[in-house]
């Protein structure tokens, strides 16, 4: 189970294939996914809340392509379809929101040795940027990024003063397939992955 960012709700997996949310005040439960996008009964799937509590990213089986999972995005209100963010045809998993909710970090075997015979796959760490502004900022050269920081220093000071307010996650689905970035220089047998808050450093076990 995972608490929502504001601590008012609790997400959990029911019967190993459905994502559900319990409102801790009203005790009402709402369904986020209906179970049709996860066929395994071996232990559930990975998912994560967005920082604003309005979205989930999750592993799911898209296009009835079991056992290969994709990375999805779905409304936390329980009234939306899962958006397939990867459509790779190969296994992707372990999604988490990073960079203040502007991107999703995940691992995939789309570039490494693939499990065509159900063994021997290698992984890479990836980012999918949810909006163009975050992608453009990430793509800046070191010199351009320093200029960007200098030009926006006053704006950052104002934002730091109001840091207690949670910003809404901006989701722009148009051309999102062009905002997927490979972070690791080579594929490996990966464990967990983390990225620093400023997006400069990737940590992973391999």
Question: Predicted segment positions?
Answer:
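Blade-terminus and WD-like Trp-Asp/Gly-His loop motifs, strongest in beta-propeller folds
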Residues: 1-9, 47-56, 95-104, 193-201
């Amino acid at each position: 189970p995972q608490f929502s960012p504001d601590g008012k709700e609790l997400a959990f997996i029911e019967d190993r294939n459905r994502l559900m949310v319990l409102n801790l005040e009203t005790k009402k439960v709402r369904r986020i996914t209906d179970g049709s996008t996860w066929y395994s009964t071996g232990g559930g799937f990975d998912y994560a809340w967005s920082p604003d509590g309005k979205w989930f990213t999750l592993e799911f089986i898209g296009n009835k392509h079991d056992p290969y999972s994709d990375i999805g995005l779905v409304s936390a209100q329980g009234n939306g379809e899962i958006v397939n963010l990867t459509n790779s045809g190969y296994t992707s998993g372990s999604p988490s929101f990073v960079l203040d909710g502007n991107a999703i970090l995940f691992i995939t075997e789309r570039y490494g040795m693939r499990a065509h015979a159900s063994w021997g796959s290698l992984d890479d760490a990836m980012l999918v940027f949810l909006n163009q502004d975050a992608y453009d900022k990430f793509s800046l050269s070191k010199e351009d990024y320093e200029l960007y920081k200098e030009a926006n220093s006053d704006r950052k000071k104002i934002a730091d003063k109001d840091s207690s307010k949670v910003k809404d996650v901006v989701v722009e689905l148009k051309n999102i397939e062009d905002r997927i970035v490979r972070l690791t220089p080579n594929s490996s047998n990966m464990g967990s992955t983390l990225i620093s808050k400023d997006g400069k450093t990737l940590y992973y076990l391999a």
